Amino acid sequence: GVLKIAKSKTPLRVKWSRRIKGEVSSITVSKDSADRYFVSLLSEEIVESKPILTKSVGIDLGLTDFVIASDGIKYRPLKATAKYAQKLKKLQRRLSKKQHSKYKGDTTPKSKNYIKAQKKVSKVHAKIADSRNDFLQKLSTKLISENQVICLEDLNVAGMIKNRKLSKHIADASWNKFVTMLQYKAQWYGRTLSFVSPWFPSSQICSNCG
């Protein structure tokens, strides 16, 4: 598709991620570390609540299984992320061997090969972020669409991230981002997201009787 903006003489060729609803009030163009350009459109839309359901579910967040639900379903972490992670390690090792400043005050300039390798690393980081975001969006939408009430363990993620053995795994899993998605989607569609004590077996409750 194409997009016309005031500061550009020619229309911009764009790939739409979704259909825009409502009247657009502002447009923001940004560029990420992988040299990709994004256009963010702000519009106001009335979101209709979904039909009321009788089903509820309790979920626990984990690392081996990303979500463990009380109805017996387990959702594994995205495999694509692990695949990209292996590629990222190789590229980062190659990057470290290229000419660049290696400590504070080092004036060694970045070589052309270093800059090229750095862009490759940024692109893989972007692919990981895109894959993870897509996974979280789809799973959060599925849970919200299929359940009227979702009970979730109230985790102290900030405290857990201080644990060096867990910090990277928790950050990679994006627990906070997933919970945020559940919160705003529950508000949009008239669902209830209830936080319970970490000692309450939320994934062991009956999904039909609660």
Q: What do the PLM-derived regions correspond to, one by one?
A:
Residues 8-14:
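Short Pro/Gly-enriched beta-strand edge/turn motifs at strand-loop
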Residues 3-7, 18-210:
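Positively charged, helix-rich recognition surfaces that bind polyanionic ligands
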